[in-house]
A protein has these predicted regions:
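Basic, Lys/Arg-enriched alpha-helical interface segments
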Residues: 1-79, 87-93, 101-106
Length: 106
């Protein structure tokens, strides 16, 4: 016998739209060519962000940024490998990816 779920428990919002900044696309190509970083794990984080309306779980160390990056969030893909993103309404925009020194040194 199968249990029936009420209709309200089956409803969900559609996934967010996504976009990426030119700087993110350049970072992606550079990091993919280097072979030093787990791009599949980065893609996993991106898909979770697109599919959910909430910040990532604690294992991603997802947090808001301050200063010049005040309207952005950062998550740790692995070690010092980071993803910087922001939301604009129902759209998530991937801004940069790389290490702390690559992203925050002037």
């Amino acid at each position: 016998m199968t249990s029936r779920k009420p209709a309200s428990s089956k409803r969900a919002a559609p996934p967010r739209a996504s976009d990426s900044a030119k700087s993110f696309r350049k970072d992606w190509e550079r990091l993919t060519r280097s072979g030093r970083y787990d791009m599949k794990r980065l893609k996993e984080a991106m898909l979770l962000l697109i599919a959910n309306d909430e910040p990532l779980g604690p294992e991603w160390l997802d947090h808001p940024l301050k200063g010049d990056w005040a309207d952005h969030r950062e998550c740790h893909i692995g070690g010092d490998f980071l993803l910087i993103y922001r939301t604009d309404g129902d759209t998530i925009i991937f801004v940069r990816t790389g290490t702390h020194s690559e992203l925050f040194e002037e």
